[in-house]
């Protein structure tokens, strides 16, 4: 492979600051993406001139295997924003794959609440784009988080009540 002879080729920048990784991720070349990342994981740090990185572009195109490979290398990549403040989740809801939306939410649940520079979360974008199936995926995810937080809150309340009851018994006994 060319990279064995000249590793610097992986950082060659084309139009709009597009690297081989960004181009491969956009076009759906999973094997190329994996090979590039195995040679140089720092390629994940490079964004195009508009701030979009390989994850943004693969998410928009619905390339599930590439999104998974990128997130496996760096789950924090899901939080990175472009110049409009959009995450890969914002891009995915405009795209074609509900599975990519799920992968991003599983990688970092907090991104569901992140607004872009115009105040739009991914749910707002899905609604505006009339992406009903994506809206449902996000809504179900939010409901599962809500159930989790209700359970956690219940556990905390029970624990606090138990501690308070124990404290009251000690005070009463003294």
Outline where the language-model segments fall.
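Ankyrin-repeat junction/capping positions
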Residues: 10-11, 44-45, 79, 113, ...
């Amino acid at each position: 492979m060319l990279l064995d002879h000249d590793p610097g080729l992986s950082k060659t920048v084309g139009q709009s600051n597009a690297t081989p990784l960004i181009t491969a991720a956009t076009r759906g070349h999973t094997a190329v993406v994996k090979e590039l990342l195995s040679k140089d994981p720092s390629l994940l740090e490079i964004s195009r001139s508009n701030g979009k990185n390989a994850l943004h572009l693969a998410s928009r195109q619905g390339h599930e295997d590439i999104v998974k490979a990128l997130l496996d290398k760096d789950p924090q990549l899901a939080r990175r924003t472009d110049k409009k403040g959009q995450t890969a989740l914002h891009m995915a809801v405009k795209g074609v794959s509900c599975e990519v939306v799920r992968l991003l939410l599983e990688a970092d649940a907090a991104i569901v609440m992140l607004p872009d520079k115009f105040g739009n979360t991914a749910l707002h974008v899905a609604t505006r784009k009339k992406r009903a199936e994506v809206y449902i995926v996000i809504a179900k995810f939010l409901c599962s988080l809500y159930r989790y937080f209700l359970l956690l809150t219940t556990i905390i309340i029970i624990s606090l009540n138990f501690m308070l009851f124990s404290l009251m018994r000690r005070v009463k006994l003294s």
